Amino acid sequence: MDGILNSKTNTFVFIRHGATASNLEKKYCGKASDEDLCEEGKNALIKRKEEGLYPPVDYLFCGKKKRCISTAEIIYPGHNYKIPPEFDEIDFGDFEGKSFEELKGNPDYQKWLESGGTLPFPNGESREEYVRKMMKGFQKIATFVPENSTVGVIAHGGTIMAILSAISGKGYFDFQAHCGCGYICKIYGDENMLNVDITELG
């Protein structure tokens, strides 16, 4: 986390994009897919917004895919947003578009499961390289925003897991957010000690 915030104090609101049809079908929907939100996903976001789940933000960033941009426009209509080029979902490779049921019996999938998700996806990305890429994008955001800002980040589940596990030192799968849900991450301290407090959104 060297120099992540240059001793700045900020609050980051991480929100996973709303549901797509593939999400509801429990399929791997990654970098290769630019699927937009389904009606059920849109309606769920609107309901959560009306219930006051999403706090106001000073700055807004979102992933490049339609599902992230549509989510940003539903939750924060009219708010300017920036799209960091790094913020994409992981490349699931041969698992893209397939469900757990469809992958049962696939030896490559079994090996990946047994590794705890640490093996690279066949013909896709490794978790290690993906985390590095996501942290590069997060560093840019952290440098860009002024101190004491509340920063919205609407992204993919993988992006959220990568960043929060890297800055907290906890496990990658400790930060699995449901669609439309997420985490509030407060980062504060000085050049000697960086503190990170993460709570579930809502």
Language-model regions, residue ranges each:
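Active-site-proximal alpha-helix that buttresses catalytic centers in soluble enzyme cores
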Residues: 9-11, 15-79
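Generic beta-sheet signal
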Residues: 12, 149-157
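Short hydrophobic/aromatic-enriched beta-strand-loop microsegments
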Residues: 17, 79-86, 171-180
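Short active-site segment of divalent metal-dependent hydrolases/proteases
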Residues: 20, 159-160
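Phosphate-handling substructures
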Residues: 35-36, 75-133
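Glycine-rich phosphate-binding loop signature in dinucleotide/nucleotide-binding domains
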Residues: 52-56, 141-149
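Short beta-strand scaffold positions
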Residues: 62-63, 132, 154-155
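Domain-level recognition of soluble alpha/beta enzyme cores
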Residues: 168-195
